[in-house]
Amino acid sequence: MDSKNTQVAIVGRPNVGKSTLFNRLVGERRAIVGDEPGITRDRIYGEVEWAGRKFSLIDTGGIVPDDDAVIPANILKQAGVAIDQSQLLVWVVDARAGITQLDEELAALLRSTGKPVLIAANKTDSAKLESESTEFFRFGFDDVFPISAEQSIGVGELLDRIVETLEHAVVDDAEPSASAELRLAIVGRPNVGK
């Protein structure tokens, strides 16, 4: 797995702990963290090494799909670039808040990418919240990881699955599919026997 070509984007709505998770995974405080929404506006890149594997990690600002204000629109654009560049998306949700309307919108957006999505149910720092984080399975993605980025709870399991998913993605990209659809276009002037 080549870290320069293997990228993982951390995405989610504002104030769910994306930058805290980013800092935890890269092992240093690179992204600014605060209680106010909209602190992270541009993409922030870092390198992660886990279980002998390296990959690039991208922190994004909080996504608000239907906000027409200039700053949120730019954040959405920056997040879109990160999503396009990545082979895997880590969707951070707030386990304390539960599912919100914005989470519903983001689920549809992330599903439309066709990329693998791992849900990190952040702020899960009690057994009750860990149990309640299973509600995020309702979005139809394969994995929900109850974590606390601040306290490093569940982060190792999330990293294990990131590495495993990236290894499968790299193998799948390297092997052409036998069922790949062939597209053919026959073009020419009208009435020439195409």
Regions found by a protein language model. Give the residues of each.
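Canonical P-loop GTPase G-domain recognition
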Residues: K115-L118, K123-P176
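Conserved nucleotide-binding/hydrolysis micro-motifs of P-loop NTPases
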Residues: P37-I39, G62-V64, R96-G98, K123-K128, ...
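Short glycine-/polar-rich loops that comprise or flank the Walker A/P-loop
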Residues: T6, D84-L89, T113-V117, G140-D143, ...
